């Protein structure tokens, strides 16, 4: 399973289509996310560490919007609670197929990993089992804003007492100066990782209609409205952050 460099937007396009998680994206996704999301490896590895604190025996651990299963792999490496299993969910058939391949490869490299189930499903309609950990790693921002509260409410209902939702998202900022500065720093991060001005511009055009970031304040207000009692930011790098939401 070779990991190809991300060159999806390297050539000029007459019309830039909306971004979709198709086979072309799957082929370059590991390179794309590493070069586009500052702090991504730190978030993924520590999601497993955080989950180990909240995981409870004989409960589900959800990876919602699993893409290629990086978070699922981290959960399996770090959680040791008896009877837990990981449920990885994505609505992209191409992502699900490759995710299964990566998780099968992980099985061959490690012993005593948690069992994992990979589902091709829509998390907006998926019935949730009782869960001690739910991870949403840069997933909510691709859900229509008007559907986010209901989804979080269903997740809250599925969470066991003492469990946690771990939510990672790109942020926007109400203060114009803060927004401009962090956006420019993020562009500098992409340039430092080898993306050209053309690639940056075309990727922005592709994704601006399908990814709708919220402010940190909006996230906190929505999570409280969904029934969570406490929201704790645990990581931020530029305009990317991760939160722990407690029931």
UniProtKB/Swiss-Prot annotation:
<dbReference type="GO" id="GO:0002098">
    <property type="term" value="P:tRNA wobble uridine modification"/>
</dbReference>
<feature type="binding site">
    <location>
        <begin position="90"/>
        <end position="91"/>
    </location>
    <ligand>
        <name>S-adenosyl-L-methionine</name>
    </ligand>
</feature>
<comment type="function">
    <text>Catalyzes the conversion of S-adenosyl-L-methionine (SAM) to carboxy-S-adenosyl-L-methionine (Cx-SAM).</text>
</comment>
<dbReference type="InterPro" id="IPR029063">
    <property type="entry name" value="SAM-dependent_MTases_sf"/>
</dbReference>
<feature type="binding site">
    <location>
        <begin position="122"/>
        <end position="123"/>
    </location>
    <ligand>
        <name>S-adenosyl-L-methionine</name>
    </ligand>
</feature>
<feature type="binding site">
    <location>
        <position position="137"/>
    </location>
    <ligand>
        <name>S-adenosyl-L-methionine</name>
    </ligand>
</feature>
<keyword id="KW-0949">S-adenosyl-L-methionine</keyword>
<dbReference type="InterPro" id="IPR005271">
    <property type="entry name" value="CmoA"/>
</dbReference>
<feature type="binding site">
    <location>
        <position position="204"/>
    </location>
    <ligand>
        <name>S-adenosyl-L-methionine</name>
    </ligand>
</feature>
<dbReference type="GO" id="GO:1904047">
    <property type="term" value="F:S-adenosyl-L-methionine binding"/>
</dbReference>
<feature type="binding site">
    <location>
        <position position="40"/>
    </location>
    <ligand>
        <name>S-adenosyl-L-methionine</name>
    </ligand>
</feature>
<keyword id="KW-0808">Transferase</keyword>
<feature type="binding site">
    <location>
        <begin position="65"/>
        <end position="67"/>
    </location>
    <ligand>
        <name>S-adenosyl-L-methionine</name>
    </ligand>
</feature>
<comment type="subunit">
    <text>Homodimer.</text>
</comment>
<dbReference type="GO" id="GO:0016743">
    <property type="term" value="F:carboxyl- or carbamoyltransferase activity"/>
</dbReference>
<comment type="similarity">
    <text>Belongs to the class I-like SAM-binding methyltransferase superfamily. Cx-SAM synthase family.</text>
</comment>
<dbReference type="InterPro" id="IPR041698">
    <property type="entry name" value="Methyltransf_25"/>
</dbReference>
<protein>
    <recommendedName>
        <fullName>Carboxy-S-adenosyl-L-methionine synthase</fullName>
        <ecNumber>2.1.3.-</ecNumber>
    </recommendedName>
</protein>
<dbReference type="Pfam" id="PF13649">
    <property type="entry name" value="Methyltransf_25"/>
</dbReference>
